[in-house]
Amino acid sequence: MNRPILACIFLSALAPLHAEPVFASFPLTASRTLSTSDRILARAFKTKTSGFMVKFQGTVIRKLPDDIDGSRHQRFIVRLNSGQTLLIAHNIDLAPRVSTLKTNNAVTIYGEYIWNSQGGLIHETHHRPDGSKGGGWIRYKGVIYQ
């Protein structure tokens, strides 16, 4: 008689684990005060959505070596207030390098989100080579790199 009751209690205790908030993958600050862009990026990560332009702000947490295969890209990792991390791939054949970039500094970025299992990738942070309007950018210490 005690076994069914224990099983119900055990299963009831596990039930909340299945009702994850959007920010469950990023437990650092699962807060309702997150920016709209942090919420959009968290949802995109959770649903494996890619291919949309987004503007967001984050903190540079790591500088990586440039990717020099094909088009050259300056690479660094940004952490959002949600705790989600994004790899930034900034095409330095089309836009100037963010040469003064330092870790622990804020950066605002407008680029295209591509899903990956580590939080996502942002690219297209440059002007459009065909001269059309649009394109992305990086704002760092008041300077726009496009």
Regions found by a protein language model. Give the residues of each.
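Positively charged n-region of N-terminal signal peptides that target proteins for export
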Residues: 1-4
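Bacterial N-terminal signal peptides
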Residues: 8-16
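OB-fold and OB-like single-stranded nucleic-acid-recognition modules
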Residues: 19-146
